[in-house]
Amino acid sequence: MANSNNFSKTNAQQVRKQNQQSAAGQGQFGTEFASETNAQQVRKQNQQSAGQQGQFGTEFASETDAQQVRQQNQSAEQNKQQNS
């Protein structure tokens, strides 16, 4: 079976025109999306989020009674040794 190579000519002028249009379109989208982001608002939200993380850390830490945990661990260890 013969292998026939079909070459099509590339229109360099057409390619340049498409590249220019594409580059122009990217600029429009870049500006459009960038203008929708309020940097000051994002900073404010990040600060609020960081402050809330501290509150949750304190809240959960205060629910743990370290002395009670130590006693439970000691009792469990004693029971383990008795059953061995």
From Swiss-Prot:
Biased composition (Polar residues): 1-25, 34-44
Residue ranges with Low complexity bias: 45-57, 71-84
Entry's Gene Ontology BP terms: sporulation resulting in formation of a cellular spore
Region ranges (Disordered): 1-84
Keyword Cytoplasm: no
Placement of Sequence repeats on the sequence: 21-47, 48-74
Induction: Monocistronically transcribed in the late sporulation phase and cotranscribed with mutY and/or fabL during exponential growth. However, sspE is not translated during this period.
Keyword Transport: no
Alphabetic keyword roster: Repeat, Sporulation
Function of the protein: SASP are proteins degraded in the first minutes of spore germination and provide amino acids for both new protein synthesis and metabolism. These proteins may be involved in dormant spore's high resistance to UV light.
Family: Belongs to the gamma-type SASP family.
Name recorded for this polypeptide: Small, acid-soluble spore protein gamma-type
Organism: Bacillus subtilis (strain 168)
Organism phylogeny: Bacteria, Bacillati, Bacillota, Bacilli, Bacillales
Gene designation per UniProt: sspE
